[in-house]
Amino acid sequence: DVAVDLRSNSETYGKWYGVILSAENKKQFLIPEGFAHGFLVLSNEAEFCYKVNDFYHPNDEGGMAWNDPEIGIEWPQLKGEYKGNASAESYTLEDGTALNLSDKDQKWLGLKDTFKF
């Protein structure tokens, strides 16, 4: 799991923090308002549960490129090269498994083009 600070007045704007969550380590990850959230599933199966601070509003949904070099998230077990967009086609996991991203997630722009809080 990864969180990226989108608060434009923050000293940590554009910085990321990540943690591996698993059934074994039983960790949870609290992501405050003003941060983007992303995750990479490293197993064949996963159960993903989350809680938010308000009701879902489709018009409030946003996103950013998961592989933006300006942020430089170090995704675990990932091999590949940035090709100028959020497409997963040039990336695999270390075991050769292809990434599976939704069409929506492959179209997000980088940090500089993302909304700020």
Label the model's feature ranges.
Residues 1-27, 40-45, 52-117:
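Non-catalytic, conserved peripheral segments adjacent to functional cores
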Residues 37:
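Active-site micro-motifs of SAM-dependent methyltransferase domains
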